[in-house]
């Protein structure tokens, strides 16, 4: 089904801190749009002061992390065709910032905690003399972690960090 010309309703969190509330928007969709395209169009046409963090629009930087209909996703990689299909007919698409992190404004959160925790992790220094082998299987196993783009969606979905008031103690 083509989305071109479809009018879609959105609810986007606007404001700062506790005073933030969902604001309603309607937008005409184009074929091939991603959620970030919609946010940019709302920003350009209706809300020029809307705060949103993004950088590459290619799924490489992780800056545009948000919750779309309650699911943590990258806005630049989430196709509107998928979101429209998942959203019950007549319901708006809801876009909120990540819940785990302190809310700054609109769709922007403070993710500095992640970097602070990383700084507290002591480096592992191996023995002076290399008396071990690093085989290809081990290299393949750790490669997955090198692919991290620091979008922090994994941290956002962790129920311990998300729901525990003292989540800093777990780091």
Label each region the model flagged.
Residues 1-171:
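Signature of N-terminal electron-transfer/Fe-S-associated modules in redox systems
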